[in-house]
Amino acid sequence: MMQDLRLILIVVGAIAIIALLLHGLWTSRKERSAVFRDRPVKRLKQERQDQDEPPLSERDEGVGEVRVTRVRHDDDAPLSRLASRVGEGERDDASDPLLADGFGQPVSNAPRAHREPPQIRSAEPAMPAREQVASDSDDMGGGDDDDPLLPAASRAAAPQTDYRSSAPAADAPAPAAESSVKAAQVPEKETVLVLHVAAHNGTVLSGEELLQSVLQAGFQFGEMNIFHRHLNPSGSGPVLFSLANMVKPGSFNPEDMADFTTPGISMFMMVPSYGDAHQNFKLMLQSAQRIADDCGGVVLDDERRMMTPQKLDGYKARIRQVLEANAGV
């Protein structure tokens, strides 16, 4: 018995739900057809009312406020509402006397607003028409900046800020700065290390003493008329570093060294070089110090300043960077 009653209730409930759905669909279609059927009539009535309205300059000062009546439409027809809105916006721009006289924007561009003809009230003081139009527009919440259907001239009147005016000028030097930074970050794959042996201020190095000290340090006279330090002191093997005159053109004449004087000499080596670059630089530094002691000079760095421990660390760092750059190839 209870199962039969439950089955009956389920059937009755299903029938009721189906009936409600059918009734809702029928009501929705009926309202939609009514909206589409009444819209041409409303448009024609609106055009006639706009044509019958006298210009604002011909109206009396006692014109009452313009009232706006909101008409709620069905939300199931967004495309039709958009088409209607565009059509009504174009007609309002062409026929509204308020726009023709230059008093501002249309009172309403939305399809939900229906404007009734003004009513003349003799007993009550009337507000100016311009203030009424502005107040009605504010009540409807339709800002000029938010409505895409407003005329282009009215949107152009609003102040606009160009945020692109100063940015290119400030960013113009950026490519050059970035290129210089990238160039500085690229490690060198070869470099030249230079040491100088210079005479004390106001003195010069004697050619005869210089030649004797250079030969004792293991240098051999060779190409480009300068001295070279080979792997073997006898002059065989690859060149490790070289010695030239500090004065241009930098060459020597071994046969004329007795009458030769110079303010100093320069020693240089290429990195990478044959063998261990660190050991080759150490040997070049020892040779420079020996020549300076023999000839009464001082050892200077590549900027012709006194050699310091910090500068020696800089030389070693340059050697290490070049070797690492070549090892990564």
From Swiss-Prot:
Compartments, as annotated in UniProt: Cell inner membrane
Membrane topology category: Single-pass type I membrane protein
Disordered as annotated region, ranges: 45-183
InterPro entries in UniProt: Cell_div_ZipA (IPR011919), ZipA_FtsZ-bd_C (IPR007449), ZipA_FtsZ-bd_C_sf (IPR036765)
Residue spans, topological domain Cytoplasmic: 28-329
Single GO BP term: division septum assembly
Alphabetized CDD domains for the sequence: ZipA
A Pfam family per the record: ZipA_C
Family: Belongs to the ZipA family.
Assembly mode: Interacts with FtsZ via their C-terminal domains.
Function statement: Essential cell division protein that stabilizes the FtsZ protofilaments by cross-linking them and that serves as a cytoplasmic membrane anchor for the Z ring. Also required for the recruitment to the septal ring of downstream cell division proteins.
UniProt protein name: Cell division protein ZipA
